Amino acid sequence: MKGSHPNAGSLLEPLHKLNPFSENSTSGHRKNASDHSADGETRPIAIEMKDSKGNTVPVGNSRPSKASNWLAGLMEDKNQRWRRSMEDTHICLYDFGGNQDDGFVAVYDGHAGIQASDYCQKNLHKVLLEKVRNEPDRLVTDLMDETFVEVNSKIAKATHNDICGCTAAVAFFRYEKNRTRRVLYTANAGDARIVLCRDGKAIRLSYDHKGSDANESRRVTQLGGLMVQNRINGVLAVTRALGDTYLKELVSAHPFTTETRIWNGHDEFFIIACDGLWDVVSDQEAVDFVRNFVSPREAAVRLVEFALKRLSTDNITCIVVNLTRNPGDLDDSGLTADNDSYSNDYY
C-alpha cells in the first residue's frame, strides 16, 4: 500500500511513495436490454461506451456472473428524519474494462444539489478507464489524480451550476502480472471514506479532507482563504471536493491516493461509504460489525441501520465489497442497473 497508518501491520507492502496531499465523456449504454434470461436467471448487464476515437469498448457488468470472485452489497438511506433529498450517488462495476474480476466501486456525496454527484457517477469511471487503456505503463494513482482534476474541470459547465459539489471515494482493483498479484487502488477527495479489513483490523485507505484538519486548514489559509468554525470562508466543511467552482481557488480536486496489494487469506473486505456513516461509526466498529455477516448486502443494510440508530443526520450510502466470493453465494447485492446511471432504483 502506498503510505501507511499506525495500525497497518507488516503485510502492507509499500509499492510507491504516497503523497497524501497530492475529453468529453460519452454516455454508457447497456449491451443487453434485460438482465434476466428466459429461465428467469439473473445475468449481468454489459455496459459499453464510445472512447475518444469513437470505438465501442466494454466498461463492465452491472452484476456479478457465476464466475465472479468478489461480491458487493449496497444500502442507501435518505435519512428522511433529517434530510429532504438524497444527494448521494454510487456505482459498482464487475469485470471493469472487460477484464475478468477487475472492479470499480465509488460513492459520491453531493452538497448544494445532486448535480455534481450525478455527473461523477455517470462519467468519472469512464474517464479513468480511458486513461488506463491509453497509458498502461503509468502509475494508476497518477491517472486517478488526473481523472479527478479533469472531471472537476467539467462539472460546472455540464451542470450549469457553480455551487454544487461532491466528495468522492473511488476504488479500482485488478489482477496484475499475469494474475499473480491483485492490487487495490483508491482515491478520495473530501470525507467519504474507504476502510479495508485485514486480519480483522481496520486499515483506512482514505484521508478526511475537512476544515478541522490542521494540514488542510493550513493549505486553505496559505491560499488566502478564511477558516471560520472549520469551514472554508464560513461555508464549506470539506476542503477537497469535485465541483464547488465558486471556491475553486481554495477547494482542491486532487485526491488522496493509495495502492495496496491484496493478500488472499488476510484481506477480507473493504467498506466504502459517505460521511453519514463515518460521523457516527468508527473504522474498527464498522469492520467488527461487518464481520458478523456472510452476505455483503446484509452487512451493508445492518450497518446503515446501526448508523441511523446512532442518530446520523446525513444521507447514508454504504457499499461492502467482499474480496473473495464463496461458491454458491447469491447476488443479493441490492445493486441494479435499471437505468444508465446505475442507481436510485433498488427497492
From Swiss-Prot:
The protein, known as: Protein phosphatase 2C homolog 1
Substrates-to-products reaction catalysed: O-phospho-L-seryl-[protein] + H2O = L-seryl-[protein] + phosphate; O-phospho-L-threonyl-[protein] + H2O = L-threonyl-[protein] + phosphate
Note on how the cofactor is bound: Binds 2 magnesium or manganese ions per subunit.
Gene3D superfamilies in the record: PPM-type phosphatase domain
Function of the protein: Serine and threonine phosphatase. Has a specialized role in the heat shock response. May be responsible for the dephosphorylation of hsp90.
EC number: 3.1.3.16
Enzyme class: hydrolase
Cofactor(s) recorded in Swiss-Prot or TrEMBL: Mg(2+); Mn(2+)
Listed GO CC annotations: cytoplasm; cytosol; nucleus
Gene giving rise to this polypeptide: ptc1
Record flagged with keyword Hydrolase: yes
